């Protein structure tokens, strides 16, 4: 029972992360790419920290499943199998969150790059348009001297 509760706790945290990912997905195309990029980076860090905490438990649980039946008897095998199943659910959710955040990061980064390109295009056009009158002014000014 205690071990099952230990694996139930991460689901609450993963649900909070999922809710935040959903919020970021909804806001990603509303023109706040820089803020979204920061939020996605923070969420990626949370998921990475979570993965670092959960991954080492895999070997422990697999060892417990194989050796626990020898020590406690075959009657505990279904419970240990359930624990491994809970672990796999947590790990699969973390993998899903990681992939979603990677895709969101790439998308948001692309949107930010597209906006930057638009600004650079506008500045290039402005520079070209202002170059011609400035050149004529300089040429005319030199001829006056």
Q: What spans do the regions from the language model cover?
A:
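Membrane-interfacial hairpin junctions
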Residues: 142-145
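Membrane-associated alpha-helical segments
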Residues: 6, 14-15, 22-140
């Amino acid at each position: 029972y205690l071990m099952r509760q230990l694996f139930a706790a991460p689901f609450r945290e993963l649900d909070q992360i999922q809710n935040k990912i959903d919020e970021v997905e909804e806001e990603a195309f509303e023109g706040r790419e820089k803020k979204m990029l920061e939020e996605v980076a923070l969420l990626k860090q949370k998921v990475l920290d979570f993965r670092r905490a959960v991954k080492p438990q895999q070997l422990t649980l697999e060892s417990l499943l194989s050796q626990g039946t020898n020590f406690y008897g075959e009657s505990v095998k279904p419970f240990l199998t359930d624990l491994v199943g809970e672990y796999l659910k947590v790990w699969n959710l973390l993998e899903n969150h990681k992939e979603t955040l990677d895709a969101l990061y790439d998308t948001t980064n692309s949107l930010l790059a597209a906006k930057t390109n638009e600004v650079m295009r506008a500045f290039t056009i402005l520079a070209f348009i202002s170059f011609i009158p400035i050149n004529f002014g300089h040429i005319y000014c030199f001829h006056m001297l």
